[in-house]
UniProtKB/Swiss-Prot annotation:
One of its GO terms (molecular function) is unfolded protein binding. It comes from the Bacteria. Together with the chaperonin GroEL, plays an essential role in assisting protein folding. The GroEL-GroES system forms a nano-cage that allows encapsulation of the non-native substrate proteins and provides a physical environment optimized to promote and accelerate protein folding. GroES binds to the apical surface of the GroEL ring, thereby capping the opening of the GroEL channel. This is Co-chaperonin GroES. The keyword Calcium does not apply. The gene is groES. It comes from Nostoc punctiforme (strain ATCC 29133 / PCC 73102). Heptamer of 7 subunits arranged in a ring. Interacts with the chaperonin GroEL. Keywords: Chaperone, Cytoplasm. GO terms for biological process: chaperone cofactor-dependent protein refolding. GO terms for cellular component: cytoplasm. HAMAP family: CH10. The keyword Chaperone applies. PROSITE patterns: CHAPERONINS_CPN10 (PS00681). It is found in: Cytoplasm.
Length: 103
């Protein structure tokens, strides 16, 4: 069996799913102390890198997503599925898990 190679360009979300590149969490405190991985808070901000086509309405048409690729978004802390591609962290979310677009 051939190995599966994933990259951002090969991930295409379905339905109302949103693929978000997670902003790195702080490595050290304001006082200069380095934080161990167990003490870091899970990031809640990231950049949208891919969108699904939207959820289907009862009449079969698609409901367009309110966000677009490139938007910086704030999402629920424990929402979605965490995915690591190379050294980068991503999260696959449902549109309803996105709380706001950060301007």
């Amino acid at each position: 069996m051939a190995a599966l190679s994933l990259s951002v360009s090969t991930v295409k979300p379905l339905s109302d799913r949103v693929f978000v590149k997670v902003n790195a969490s702080e490595e050290k405190t304001a006082g200069g102390l380095y934080l161990p991985d167990t003490a870091k808070e899970k990031p809640q901000v990231g950049e949208v890198v891919a969108l699904g086509p939207g959820k289907r309405n009862e009449d079969g048409s698609r409901q367009e997503l309110e966000i677009k690729v490139g938007d910086k978004v704030l999402y629920s802390k424990y929402a979605g599925t965490d995915i690591k591609l190379g050294t980068e962290e991503y999260v696959l979310l449902s549109e309803k898990d996105i709380l706001a677009v950060v301007i």
